[in-house]
A protein has these predicted regions:
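Interfacial loop-to-helix junctions that mark the boundaries of transmembrane helices
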Residues: 1-6, 141-153, 194-198, 223-245, ...
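Membrane-embedded alpha-helical segments and adjacent helix-loop junctions characteristic
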Residues: 1-95, 273-352
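Generic alpha-helical transmembrane segments of integral inner-membrane proteins
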Residues: 12, 16, 47, 51, ...
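Flexible hinge motifs at transmembrane-helix junctions and intramembrane kinks/re-entrant loops
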Residues: 1, 63, 165-173, 194-202, ...
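Residue-level recognition of membrane-helix boundary sites in multi-pass small-molecule transporters
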Residues: 44-45, 103, 147, 244, ...
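Juxtamembrane and boundary regions of transmembrane helices in multi-pass small-molecule transporters
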Residues: 12, 23-29, 62, 80-102, ...
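Alpha-helical transmembrane segments
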Residues: 5-15, 58-73, 112, 148-165, ...
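C-terminal transmembrane helix pair
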Residues: 153, 280-299, 310-430
Length: 430
């Protein structure tokens, strides 16, 4: 049953939607419009790229997002360097010495990792947490798309501007006040895309339909008013989950015709095959591992060995977990690390009588906050290949951002998770 977990189908449906966006270049159009809207001064260009990258990373893989934003960013850097050289500004625009190139590349990589935290389908560690938490603690509150969005989106809204300010004002100031003709580069790429085609429009329709269906599937309590969920109104709330919506959206992509005469549909199997099937198999293995922890008694055994931590303040324990996961994923896969650590953290929660969400959620979030090394994440490796940054630069900037991220995640989880999920911090969901 571990390989048929609903969270696997949720992520699979999200992958299919992401493939459709990439096939018809919808993601590129969205990114270019965001960058164009946010302005053309060096700092605002960095902000535009970071917002666009983070938004796309909420829905498609951070690797695909970075691969798409990377050449656009390089085009802006090359244009800026060319114009500054023509004006004989005296600024060294060579790769490795051009601060604007360094900060833009770092901004793209870091925002790709941060953006994925916002949604349940944004990055694998989020889904790993949801699946293992459900397996180990079936009586705990359900973690659906909207539930995660309530904590993931606030984190991104706080962390992204903090990262932008840290990069552009403290760590790597661009060193230039304006980029002559910077807007033209973005407008040129938009002109190349042409008018929005049928494939893009249909993909956008399915994307919006699925996102809204996720958000409004269950009742939303605003305090003064309860918005009824569509699944309850239709009387099917016991049979419909977020994964149902995701797979239904994926089926629509295979059925909606772009050109019926030529048998061209929004998504075909050639593109569907490109989703990362290895990640899906890894999910199943992780959920099976968590079930093994429970049924074999290993979780209880680990919990008994960790009982000496009972006296440690909860907030200190959360911070230590955040720092551990952040720096551990600098040299290991965040998906594999999260899969390995979640059952252990579940056992730790039982041993210390702390609600497991307070330990497992920050671990999942922190697994996406490795900013120091090129090997830490695919986005880091991609931008490192530009030549505009060196390992010491990334390590110096990323070290302090790792610390900042751990602190932000700790505070947000400590003060938001309890009221949002309505849990008792010192009670186990048994």
């Amino acid at each position: 049953m571990s390989y048929a977990d609903q969270n696997i189908f949720l992520f699979m449906g999200g992958f299919f939607i992401a493939m459709a966006m990439q096939r018809w270049n919808l993601h590129k159009r969205i990114a270019l419009y965001i960058v164009k809207f946010l302005g053309t001064s060096p700092r605002r260009i960095v902000l535009g790229f970071m917002v666009a990258t983070a938004f796309l990373s909420m829905w498609i893989s951070n690797t695909a997002t970075t691969m798409m934003m990377f050449p656009i960013g390089l085009a802006v850097i090359f244009h800026a360097a060319s114009m500054l050289d023509k004006e004989k500004s005296g600024i060294n625009t060579a790769p490795g010495s051009f601060n604007f190139g360094l900060v833009l590349m770092l901004g793209i990589a870091y925002s790709a990792s941060i953006g994925g935290i916002a949604t349940l389908v944004g990055t694998p560690p989020n889904i790993v947490f949801a699946g293992i938490a459900k397996s180990m603690f079936p009586k705990a509150p359900e973690i659906g798309f909207l539930d995660w969005l309530k904590i993931g989106l606030p984190l991104v809204i706080i962390f992204l501007p903090v990262t932008w300010f840290y990069l552009t004002h403290i760590a790597v100031p661009p060193g230039i006040s304006k980029i002559p003709g910077g807007r033209e580069v973005i407008e040129r790429d938009l002109r190349k895309l042409g008018k929005m085609g049928t494939g893009e429009k249909l993909t956008l329709f399915v994307f919006v339909f699925v996102a809204l269906s996720w958000v409004f599937r269950r009742d939303i309590d605003l305090g003064f008013w309860v918005i009824p969920g569509w699944s309850g109104l239709l009387g099917i709330s016991d049979y419909v989950h977020d994964s149902t919506v995701a797979i239904f959206g994926a089926i629509l992509l295979f059925l909606l015709p772009v050109n019926f005469k030529k048998r061209v549909f929004v998504l075909n199997w050639e593109w569907a095959l490109r989703i990362p099937w290895g990640i899906i198999l890894l999910f199943g293995g992780g959920f099976a591992l968590a079930a093994g922890f429970q049924t074999s008694g290993l979780a209880q055994w680990i919990g008994e060995r960790l009982s000496f931590l009972c006296g440690v303040p909860t907030i200190i324990m959360i911070l230590c977990i955040c720092l551990l996961l952040t720096f551990l994923t600098e040299v290991t896969s965040n998906t594999a690390t999260t899969t390995m650590m979640m059952p252990v953290l579940g056992a730790l929660a039982v041993a210390t009588c702390i609600h497991p969400f307070l330990l497992m959620i920050p671990a999942a979030m922190s697994a996406s906050c490795a900013f120091m090394l090129p090997v830490a994440t695919p986005p880091n490796a991609i931008v490192f290949g530009s030549g505009y940054l060196k390992i010491p630069d990334m390590a110096r900037v990323g070290f302090f951002l790792n610390i900042i991220g751990a602190i932000i995640v700790t505070l947000l989880v400590y003060f938001l998770v309890i009221p949002i999920f309505g849990i008792n911090a010192l009670a186990l969901p048994f």
